[in-house]
């Protein structure tokens, strides 16, 4: 896109009219809506000022088009839209708009609507073409991002950003009640998080940057929901996000496959320190990378899955600390207990790659990749002195893929038997880890860990279309640990006050914590005995 200098942003871009004969104007009116151009006035808002016309691709148009606005206004949102409309990418079109819409609540708690469409020069205001383009932009199902926020008082705020080649539209609607001043302030605080989420979704390829939408005061805002649909390689990519005081969920579906991550915030007793959570997230992201490598998963799907897992598990510590302060008599984990858990809130996460059949000679040989992982915990007992904690982690991988017999020769399978030289791999893996902790009258009586891992690898080898081998390799391992004798003396040191004693305690507990995570590789698990 050609860079524009000295673009006036004090008011929406002023249309520039060029003189043409009647036949040229008629031809312009019949231009396809798919061909879009924008007129940008340089050096000021005066219509007589010099102007340059650019198409959305950055090339000089064969037919002039000028922007037409729903409402004439020089407010911050409209001014930003005027500057963005000359860009072609979704990210540039939506740049800053999400934050600007939420920041409106600083001075205005009412509804707001604005749209701009590119029309052939000379098209009269209110024409059927303008009405159609504006309606198409508002109704756009792709390249659209919406945010719904329900406040603690019951009011609902809906924000929508829509884009198509010839139109850009934004809307704010407040319903089901009036916003309090405190709620308006809470909405403003989400502005940066909303814009960061938009920037990630509108990027190419899309990414998930949603943690800013999880940072809200639940005493003022009851829930936050985001829905997005964007085009990726000519196909639709959808993203749905929800957060409230009890749960967080994100799901996505697109050309590469589907994913979903849910985090349960109803059992905050198990949540550890921010440092412990950071280490746990790092461990899980490494497991996702290992699963992708072993199962040949789609890189873009796994990258988005990792984003989703990290974002949904962010900013949980503050909520846990607040809950602990509000309910000090409830059962809470001490340092020794936390050393045998991940420190994460309970979750379930899954991703499934789009199935393909790359071998026309054997169409039942599909390339697949499916991965699930979860954590579930239970805290029980009649009080802190008689508490019991269990935490179960699981993961499952199922995958299949084709591979060339020669690493440096790309696989191109056809019905010709000369192309049928390959191996077909089928992977099935399972792993689990269960920690159990129990107290009787304040005395630790149980601290155990049971882990298991199994892997099955089936490889069928074909040469000239004939299967010459079919081999299945199973691997299994189990491991049981008892930490009772190790934890009992450490538990007595939890009241340590000297820096040296605290450091020794933390190091010892970190050593135990290092062992509680899932270990999907049976050989590695077996070596830890």
Report each predicted region and the residues it spans.
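N-terminal, intrinsically disordered, small/polar-rich Type III/flagellar export signal
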Residues: 105-224
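A eukaryote-biased signal for long
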Residues: 20, 242-529
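Generic "edge-of-domain/loop-turn" microfeature
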Residues: 154, 166, 177-181, 231-235, ...
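Short, flexible helical or helix-coil boundary motifs
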Residues: 41-49, 60, 73-84, 101-112, ...
């Amino acid at each position: 896109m050609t860079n524009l200098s000295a673009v006036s942003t004090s008011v929406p871009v002023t249309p520039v009219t060029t003189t043409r004969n009647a036949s040229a104007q008629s031809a312009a009116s019949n231009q396809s809506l798919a061909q879009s151009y924008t007129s940008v006035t340089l050096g000021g808002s005066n219509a007589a000022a010099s102007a340059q016309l650019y198409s959305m691709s950055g090339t000089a148009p064969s037919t002039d088009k000028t922007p037409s606005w729903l409402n004439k206004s020089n407010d911050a949102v409209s001014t930003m839209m005027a500057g963005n409309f000359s860009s072609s990418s979704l990210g540039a079109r939506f740049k800053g708009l999400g934050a600007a819409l939420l920041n409106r609540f600083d001075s205005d708690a009412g509804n707001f609507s604005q749209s701009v469409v590119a029309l052939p020069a000379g098209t009269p205001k209110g024409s059927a073409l303008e009405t159609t383009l504006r309606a198409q932009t508002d109704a756009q199902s792709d390249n659209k991002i919406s945010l719904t926020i329900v406040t603690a008082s019951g009011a609902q705020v809906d924000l929508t950003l829509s884009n198509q080649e010839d139109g850009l539209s934004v809307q704010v609607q407040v319903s089901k009640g009036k916003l309090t001043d405190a709620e308006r302030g809470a909405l403003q605080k989400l502005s940066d998080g909303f814009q960061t989420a938009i920037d990630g979704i509108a990027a190419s390829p899309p990414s998930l940057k949603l943690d800013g939408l999880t940072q809200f005061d639940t005493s003022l805002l009851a829930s936050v929901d985001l829905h997005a649909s964007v085009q990726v390689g000519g196909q639709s990519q959808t993203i749905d996000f929800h957060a409230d005081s009890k749960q967080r969920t994100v799901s996505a579906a697109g050309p590469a496959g589907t994913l979903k991550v849910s985090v349960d915030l109803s059992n905050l007793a198990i949540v550890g320190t921010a440092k412990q959570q950071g280490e746990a997230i790092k461990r899980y992201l490494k497991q996702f990378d290992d699963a992708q490598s072993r199962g040949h998963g789609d890189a873009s799907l796994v990258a988005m899955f990792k984003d989703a897992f990290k974002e949904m598990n962010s900013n949980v510590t503050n909520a846990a600390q607040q809950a602990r302060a509000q309910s000090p008599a409830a059962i809470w984990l001490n340092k020794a207990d936390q050393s045998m858990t991940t420190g994460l809130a309970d979750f379930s996460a899954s991703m499934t790659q789009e199935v393909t059949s790359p071998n026309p000679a054997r169409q039942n040989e599909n390339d697949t990749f499916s991965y699930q992982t979860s954590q579930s915990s239970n805290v029980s007992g009649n009080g802190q002195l008689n508490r019991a904690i269990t935490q179960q982690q699981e993961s499952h991988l199922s995958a299949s893929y084709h591979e060339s017999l020669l690493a440096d020769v790309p696989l191109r399978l056809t019905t010709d038997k000369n192309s049928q030289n390959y191996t077909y791999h089928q992977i099935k893996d399972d792993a689990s880890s269960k920690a159990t902790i129990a107290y009787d009258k304040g005395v630790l009586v149980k601290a155990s860990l049971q882990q298991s891992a199994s892997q099955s690898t089936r490889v069928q080898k074909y040469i000239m279309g004939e299967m010459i081998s079919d081999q299945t390799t199973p691997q299994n391992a189990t491991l049981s640990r008892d930490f009772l004798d190790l934890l009992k003396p450490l538990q007595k040191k939890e009241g340590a006050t000297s820096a040296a004693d605290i450091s020794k305690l933390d190091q010892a507990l970190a050593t135990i914590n290092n062992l509680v995570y899932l270990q999907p590789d049976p050989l590695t698990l077996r070596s830890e005995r």
